[in-house]
């Protein structure tokens, strides 16, 4: 079934959140991987994008994800600092672009950005879009549709939602937000 769905996607079919997500979550993993590989070969070939990230805000995260050193719930020695200045992020992006990186992403610890942090992020993305040729990505936790739209307008082409495990197992690794929160 995954190979048939892969053919449909290659021909332009767009997945529907509810029905297709439930199918993908129940599909045999080997078949799902074969379908995904078919799509990759057809749409991307064997090209590899190099993506570099910058930790835009580190530590003090109020979420309790068991695997994450950024969580304030765990006693780690991770460096803690507030959201970086846009100029610092831009300079780091330029350094990575000079090393032939294709994509660049700001990632931040925490459930979501504050209003002031979102404004800093948007300034950084706009500056990178203006001064660099890399594709821009983001990972800033749980955002509103309005914030996603603002990121897109600022030049962000991909967003990393980081769904770490299955719906069934999610409560075993995190209790401060749900699997469904990640999908909204």
Q: What does each model-found stretch correspond to?
A:
Residues 73-92, 96-184:
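Core AdoMet radical
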Residues 47-79, 124-125, 168-171:
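N-terminal small/glycine-rich loop or linker at the start of catalytic domains
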Residues 11-15, 29, 36, 40-43, ...:
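Amphipathic, alpha-helical segments enriched in basic
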Residues 1-63, 67:
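Flexible, acidic/Gly-rich N-terminal and inter-domain linker regions that tether
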